[in-house]
Amino acid sequence: MAVEHSAHYERMSLEEYLALVEQDPEHAYEYLDGRVYMMTGGSPDHSIIGSNLNGLLQAFLRGRRCIVYNSDVYVQLSDHYRACPDATVSCDPRDRGAQEVIRYPSLVAEVLSPTTEARDRGQKSLQYRSCPSIQEYLLISSEFPLVEVFRREKQGFWSLYTLGPGDTIELSSLGLRFPVADVYQNASFLEEANE
């Protein structure tokens, strides 16, 4: 999710966290094992990349049983973890009609920012990969064209595919392929490199 705000919160119980979310619906708060992180908007490139990815997913999945969500929707990973990925896909009928929380995502993606990258690669990555419904997890750089696709294989282990300019992203859980360049269309760092 976007960028961590400077607000610092002491450890909270789940009940205290839920009360905070209810009291302040204008902000998103991630809850990671008792620690609360207020999330705010990221850089323009972060927004462009997230919008591009969500648009690609939405266009492909239109009319199918899967739903694409942006970072406005929480993903509940357990009683101790609630995150706001930049893109989430759920194909599970139990998530249809969910108002605020998705519990059975098949794919999640995080657009990395300097303030959240360590958490996205560490604690959240472990939680995403321990969620039985998640088949693919993407980490997308917001500073240069680099996409990492973590894929759950049939044997239960995870494979990592690191992709750059000229490569094609394959999301096998959805049957979707698209160029890395499509995710980065209109990103300012690409335009600056071409000037």
Where are these regions (language model features)?
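Gly/Pro/Ser/Thr-rich low-complexity, intrinsically disordered segments predominantly at protein N-termini
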Residues: 1-195
